[in-house]
């Protein structure tokens, strides 16, 4: 089965500088945007997760490795790199 390959840009949770900070001096540096590319598995298909965009790094004969489950609220964009064909 051919799978759709996607490029997902999403906002990751992140920490501020290490150590003690003066809260009054803290500056918001915006979102940390991450790029993920892989095989899209849509919910409710096996290997997916509800309310998430699920992207697998590698698929082979029904097995997969390195699934990334990205909460839909964190997704900023998604581009289909190759539409599936039969």
Regions from the PLM with identified roles:
Residues 2-86:
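Conserved RNA-binding domains used in RNP assembly and mRNA/RNA metabolism
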